[in-house]
């Protein structure tokens, strides 16, 4: 299928926060409760629509283990967007965000759009990180923020699409040189009369049970 633009994403965060589950829910619309630990990098892709233009998202899901951090770092280069994920029921995954963000800022292009995702909001009764804390961290570091649930699919679509919307706006504002593919953006072509796949510019929001 043709596309107007291709955006490359990377999903980062600690082991077990649900990175692979978020990707699977977005690309296949299904939840797999038992998922093998990601070894190295996994890959997914999906078409969405932004401003009536078909956009292809290529998404790299990275391993959270420290031993794979050097592999992960190589994927920062050439990514237009990142989903930085923590688990709202595990405080330590939130505490490690600063380290992940430092890594991303050091190895990625300066204009990469980063979406902070507090995953597993369906388990709000086991919450260890408040919504306000996530929101404050995002505000302090210039990130977009959303809580989501890979299990119920709440805000999963929105997290990926809203990130794409921010990247698209940067293209419109002239922030990116789209002829330089190191920014994680590739200009495609569109067959007349063809629109994109599922998805559209969606409104963000909190996570409701």
UniProtKB/Swiss-Prot annotation:
Highest rank taxon of the organism: Eukaryota
Species this chain originates from: Zea mays
Annotated function: Protein transport. Probably involved in vesicular traffic.
One Pfam match: Ras
Keyword vocabulary terms for this entry: Endoplasmic reticulum, Golgi apparatus, GTP-binding, Lipoprotein, Membrane, Nucleotide-binding, Prenylation, Protein transport, Transport
Family statement: Belongs to the small GTPase superfamily. Rab family.
Full protein name: Ras-related protein Rab-2-A
GO biological process: protein transport; vesicle-mediated transport
Cellular component annotations (GO), alphabetically ordered: endoplasmic reticulum membrane; Golgi apparatus; Golgi membrane
CDD domains in the cross-refs: Rab2 (cd01866)
Annotated residues for binding of GTP: 13-21, 61-65, 119-122, 149-151
């Amino acid at each position: 299928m043709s596309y107007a633009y291709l955006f490359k994403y990377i999903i980062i965060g600690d082991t077990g926060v649900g990175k692979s589950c978020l990707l699977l829910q977005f690309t296949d619309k299904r939840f797999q409760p038992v998922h093998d630990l990601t070894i190295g990098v996994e890959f997914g892709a999906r078409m969405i629509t932004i401003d009536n233009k078909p956009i292809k998202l290529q998404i790299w899901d990275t391993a959270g283990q420290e031993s794979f951090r050097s592999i992960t770092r190589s994927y920062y280069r050439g990514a237009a967007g990142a989903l930085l994920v923590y688990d709202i029921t595990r405080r330590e995954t939130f505490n490690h965000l600063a380290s992940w963000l430092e890594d991303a800022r050091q190895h990625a292009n300066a204009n990469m759009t980063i979406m902070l995702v507090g995953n597993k909001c369906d388990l709000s009764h086991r919450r260890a990180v408040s919504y306000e804390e996530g929101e404050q961290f995002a505000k302090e570091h210039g990130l977009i923020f959303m809580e989501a649930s890979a299990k119920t699919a709440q805000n999963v679509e929105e997290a990926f699409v809203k990130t794409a919307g921010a990247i698209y706006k940067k293209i419109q504002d002239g922030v990116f040189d789209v002829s330089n593919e190191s920014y994680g953006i590739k200009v495609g072509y569109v067959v007349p009369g063809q629109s994109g796949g599922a998805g559209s510019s969606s409104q963000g929001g909190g996570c409701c049970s």
